[in-house]
Amino acid sequence: MNYLDMLTRLGVGSAHPGGFSATMSQLSRFPLPAGSRVLEVGCGTGRTSCYLAKQGFDITGLDLRPEMLAKAKLRAQAEQLDVRFVEGDITALPFEAAAFDIVLAESVTNFADIGRALAEYGRILRPGGTLYDREVIATPSITVEAYREVTGFFQLNALLTEQKWIELLQASGFAEITVCDRSAFVQHVTDDQIAYPDMNQVMDPGTVLNASVWQTSLAHDDLIAANHDYLEHALFIARK
């Protein structure tokens, strides 16, 4: 079982670095303008999208996996929210140019062709629109062995340094780029669950007794621990 299959079965709502605590901190530090048309790419089970809908934003959540979207719709129903969820690929977004004011990504772009995804974010943002993208990044000192191990486990096309991210953002038409919250990539799950328990997480039937799920989870934890010197995460804020 691969990493994304594990997340899907568990119905994890905030698997990105820092968890939902990081999401809440980001939205507090960088509040979205009222009335913004917001696209969350890789919305997963819809936790962030539903939170923003509660705050009154016009929010669209997009994900590649129909199983995730089904859980997102269940979450919206449970929270009595009207949220648009769309199945789609971040490298070929099914939206017209300049359709959104804000694009949110939480550890999603890494799992696609990064350059193509960033170009699509730029295409569907209006002039002056903003991308907020929190991603795992490689330190400049990453070894070949660690690079191969991490990209192999997560099935990534590439694991970029901060500088390479900035270069690709610039190449995609983003002129004003800020890097925030750069820190070591460490496990956050327990603290995050205590601070922000997910009351609407939906696990697939039989998941608790599925050994493959927990084997993949342990392998993930071991991988992060073994490569902590080479992994960080950061929030990229880029204005079109």
Report residues per predicted region.
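Conserved alpha-helix/loop element of class I SAM-dependent methyltransferases that forms part
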Residues: 16-34
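A short glycine-rich, Lys/Arg-flanked "PGG" loop and its adjoining helix->strand segment in the class I
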Residues: 115-130
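A short SAM/SAH-binding and catalytic strip from SAM-dependent methyltransferases
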Residues: 102-115
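A short acidic, Gly/Pro-enriched loop at the edge of an enzyme's catalytic core
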Residues: 91-102
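Conserved Class I S-adenosyl-L-methionine
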Residues: 178-240
